[in-house]
Amino acid sequence: EHADRSGYYAKLVAEELHLPKSMVKHIEYAAMMHDVGKIGIKEEILLKASKLTNAEMVEIRKHPLIGEKIIAPIEFLAPIAPLILYHHEWFDGTGYGEGLLGEEIPIGARIVAVIDSFDAMTSDRPYRKALSCEIAIDELKKGSGTQFDPKIVNAFLKVLENEKKKNNGKTS
């Protein structure tokens, strides 16, 4: 499922970047819980099979803040709250949340953004079929430097390559 895959890949990317062990754990947990705020979004919006209206987009864009409000008061999860809050920020500053730019976005949130996008692209959605890994990888490369941190994209591509070798040519 999305949360498990997100946590798995986020951990591998954080390790690939040689981040401290405690940070790796936080990033793994944040990746698993990044969409917890969707609990506060109407199901008909989440499951809608057609294009969202502007009003529905405004609603869906509240999920990182809702998630942060759920997670922040829980003492042992508090360190991951900013990662959840900022996982839809774009590297070039045009994402949503607070319009953070580049390194202003916590590295964990930048990792979650790449993993979340890749998993979303390679999974069936109510409004479209899953894209192939190859197409999703191309999309990540296209978004590198605008939507995504190029350093994170490169680390994730390395992780995917390692996973492919480990699994005899298949990406899990």
Regions found by a protein language model. Give the residues of each.
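Metal-dependent catalytic cores of enzymes that make or break cyclic nucleotides
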Residues: 1-172
